[in-house]
Amino acid sequence: MQREQSVAVAVDIGGGQTTVALIDHDGRVRYRCSAKTLRGRPVLATLDPYLRAIDTMLEHAQKEDWHVCGVGVSVPGSLDHTSRRPLLVSMLPSLNSFPLCDLLETRYQLPTQLHVDVDAALLGEYHFGAGQGCRRLLFLTINAVVGAALAIDGQVERSSNYTGHICHLPIATNGPRCSCGKRGCMNTLISMDAMQKMVQRALRRGEETSLTQRLLESASSVGGQGEPKGSRNREYFSAQLLAEEAMRGDSVAQQIYAEVGRGVGSAVARYVGLFEPHRLILSGGVLSAGNLLLTQVRRSLSTPSSSRVCSMVEVVPSLLGNDAALVGSVAPIFS
């Protein structure tokens, strides 16, 4: 007799679009669809595309005769874990303090779990990806801002002494001033926004490389008369472009990777004393440049001045990539 297939509905709320999927107990995506993220709407209007997508997943599961055992949601913000509500979701403020789990459990009669997106990504990697078999994990994602999560034996560590506002962890005393008022925060040194500013400085210095020329050509192709050269480059800069040029040997791109690698190494060194992670999982579009960033981070953790514990941290790339938070949002449901 064939065992009934168990699946869970995963909802990964993103800035441009939200992914909703059916995930099986092995972490495989069995069916998925996308729902538009509607900003600036009342809460029920914001949730409507997600609810419709969940309905579609449940209809598909019924058609396939799959047993649905729960719903997992990852959100890009902070949570009130006691009330199981989003606490602060800056891009979707109508969700703030809304009883999202209660609504979903009432509507679908399924147990529902809510996670911060970076925590969900860590759970995905722990159960099904690059974190399998590791007791003490540090997960670091480099996107527009920097996010981090820590786990011991698969349990996310939520102590404010550890992750907290990770993007505001100071890693350089003389670094750029951050919006929080401090200097040298991680967000000012290794986020995608920080990398964009590095490119802008290269443009102002007049450095002519393939990367800077591509950005200048993109800016000039849309007009921009009367604007300083390169002033519109933020519109075209991306992790994929940076990685592509770094792989081709572009000096500016490779210098950015070197600086980011040193910054990540400094951040990990700060965590070692608090947490002693055994493995660091890196995620984000900048990993598209093969092992370039991984090599830089490993090098920064193995300098003569590095502690023995730092040099023992294993540095690996994410295995689940963009699906990490999606898969991780339902991983505890199967545990």
Where are the regions a protein language model picked out?
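Short beta-strand scaffold segments in enzyme catalytic cores
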Residues: T18-L22, V146-A151
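General beta-strand structural signal in soluble alpha/beta enzymes
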Residues: T112-V116, L150
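Active-site glycine-centered loops adjacent to acidic/histidine catalytic or metal-binding residues
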Residues: D117, N143, S329
